[in-house]
Amino acid sequence: GGSSDSRHAPKETAVGMSNPGYTIEAEIRPEYRHFKGALAAARQGDEVNPEKRSSGEQFYLVQGKTYTDQELDQIEKRKWLAAKNQLGDRLFKPLQEEFQRYKKTGQYQKADSLLRYVNEEIEKQYAENPYKMSPETREMYKSVGGTPFLDGDYTVFGEIVEGMDVLEKIALVATDSNDRPKEDVIILGTKLKRK
């Protein structure tokens, strides 16, 4: 929601491509999760937005679903592998030229030693800060639901405290081939409450 090109856009038109000319620095905090009812900032994908900067105008409300322990285990595993790969890329990048030089000059033991160092550093750093959901977080995803696979990748900045039935109604609205509601859903007002 929130894209300025969605206002008065003809039906069956793809929206969400407008650009207000700015993005917002990511504020991803581990205590804010994508539980059902969370309000979060949309953003472009990692390949064009590695800093995970948020859209200056678009947001989304989390509907999601409830999860089993097995499904949550799989999500943890995928996030763990993605985090290790990112860490590996970050650690290897400054050593890449040295590694290539060793390989080109036939110094394979030195090249292997460099790779061993990077792999050991990945394991060490990841062991200090693994991706693991707390028992409370797992329980919320099992009972309330949401989208746990988005945790750690998008800025969550609020939650629905009253009117969860409105989220349910929005989720049931028929959408077109662009995943846009066939009939516009207009937010007439909001109230912000500080915790």
State what each model feature region is:
Residues G1-K195:
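Cyclophilin-like peptidyl-prolyl cis-trans isomerases
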